[in-house]
From Swiss-Prot:
PANTHER family linked: MEMBRANE PROTEIN INSERTION EFFICIENCY FACTOR-RELATED
Keyword Glycoprotein in annotation: no
Membrane topology: Peripheral membrane protein
Protein localization: Cell membrane
Pfam family, one: YidD
Primary role: Could be involved in insertion of integral membrane proteins into the membrane.
Protein name, as recorded: Putative membrane protein insertion efficiency factor
UniProt similarity note: Belongs to the UPF0161 family.
Organism listed in the record: Desulfitobacterium hafniense (strain Y51)
Any one GO cellular component localisation term in the record: plasma membrane
Classification via InterPro entries: Membr_insert_effic_factor_YidD
Taxonomic placement: Bacteria, Bacillati, Bacillota, Clostridia, Eubacteriales
NCBIfam families listed in its UniProt record: membrane protein insertion efficiency factor YidD (TIGR00278)
HAMAP family (alphabetical): UPF0161_YidD (MF_00386)
């Protein structure tokens, strides 16, 4: 239940909020897609933790690149 709610919220962000901003994610897959994959693979708690760590790495001083779940 919680997993579906979080993934739904991320999908809403991807569809309605993300297009309003310029592309800035330094990683592939994007941080929001990574978050969905992490929550699906690891569950809510560990998936959210991995998502938070990933989002904190997404800044101009990090090289980025391919970073799968």
């Amino acid at each position: 239940m919680m997993k579906r709610l979080l993934i739904g919220m991320i999908r809403i962000y991807q569809r309605y909020i993300s297009p309003l901003k310029r592309p800035s994610c330094r990683f592939y897959p994007t941080c929001s897609e990574y978050s969905i994959q992490a929550i699906q693979k690891y569950g809510v708690v560990k998936g959210c933790w991995k998502s938070l760590v990933r989002i904190l790495k997404c800044h101009p001083f990090h090289p980025g690149g391919y970073d799968p779940v």
